[in-house]
Amino acid sequence: MKLTWYGHSAFRIETGDAKILIDPYLIGNPSWTGGWEGPAEGITHVLLTHGHSDHISGALEVLGKSGAQLVANFEICMYLVGKGADGSKINPGNIGGTVDCGGFTTTFVQALHSSSFGEDGGKNVYLGNPGGLVLHFPEDRTLYHMGDTDIFSDMALINELHEPKIGIVPIGDRFTMGGAVAALACRRFFKFDTVVPCHFGTFPMIDPTPEKFEAGLEGSGVKVALPKIGETITI
C-alpha cells in the first residue's frame, strides 16, 4: 500500500487498482500549496468523512477532472451533486453500512464531531453525521481513517468487527482529540501495525507537532509513520 499525505487529513491511498483520495482538502489548505490537479491524477475514488470545508474543499474539482466515484454519507453526496458532481457516480452510505466500491469495500463508522459546510453569508448547511471510514482491501491490510473524532469506547467494537491494521488518527486537539488521548485510543482499543497521525500543524489553534502522540505510543510496538507533506511512503 502506498500512502501520500497532503497535510491535515488529506491522503492518497494506492493499492491494487484502487487510487483513493480521502478528505481532499486541496484548495485553501495552508499545509499544501501544490494544487489539486496532481493529487487528482488517476484517482478512482473520493472518500469523505464529513462535510467541513477543511475536508471537502477540493472534492468537486477532483471529481470533475477524474470522473472518480464519490463515497460519502447521503447528505454530502446530495449536496455535492447539487453543486455539480455527477449523480451517476455517487456511492452513498451511512453509519453502520458497508458499500462495495469495486475492488474494495468501505464501512461507515461513527465519529464524535460535527458536520456542516459554511456558505456565503454565514449560513451553515447540515451535512449529516460525521464518521470514520474502514477500508477493506482483499489483498492488503484493512485501513481505518478515523475522520475527526474524540476517543470513544465503541472503538473496541470497530476493532472487533474490522481488525484494522493501519490507522489514520487525528491528534491536533481543540477540534479533535489531542495526541496523548489519541495514543491512548490506539493502545487501548486497537492492534494497529502502523498509525499515521493527521489533523495537526495546519492552523495555529491546533497542536503543531505529533510529539505527544509519539510519546504516548513509546514501547507499544506500534509503528508511527510520519510522511512529509507531499511524500509517498509504502506501508
Swiss-Prot record:
Protein keywords: Hydrolase
Highest rank taxon of the organism: Bacteria
Record-linked InterPro entries: Metallo-B-lactamas (IPR001279), RibonucZ/Hydroxyglut_hydro (IPR036866), UPF0173 (IPR022877), UPF0173_UPF0282_UlaG_hydrolase (IPR050114)
TM stretches of this protein: none
Keyword Lipid metabolism recorded: no
Disulfide bonds: none
UniProt keyword Flavoprotein present: no
GO molecular function: hydrolase activity
Cited PANTHER family: UPF0173 METAL-DEPENDENT HYDROLASE MJ1163, UPF0173 METAL-DEPENDENT HYDROLASE MJ1163-RELATED
Record-stated family: Belongs to the UPF0173 family.
UniProt xrefs under NCBIfam families: PRK00685.1
HAMAP family: UPF0173 (MF_00457)
Protein name: UPF0173 metal-dependent hydrolase mll0680
Species of the source: Mesorhizobium japonicum (strain LMG 29417 / CECT 9101 / MAFF 303099)
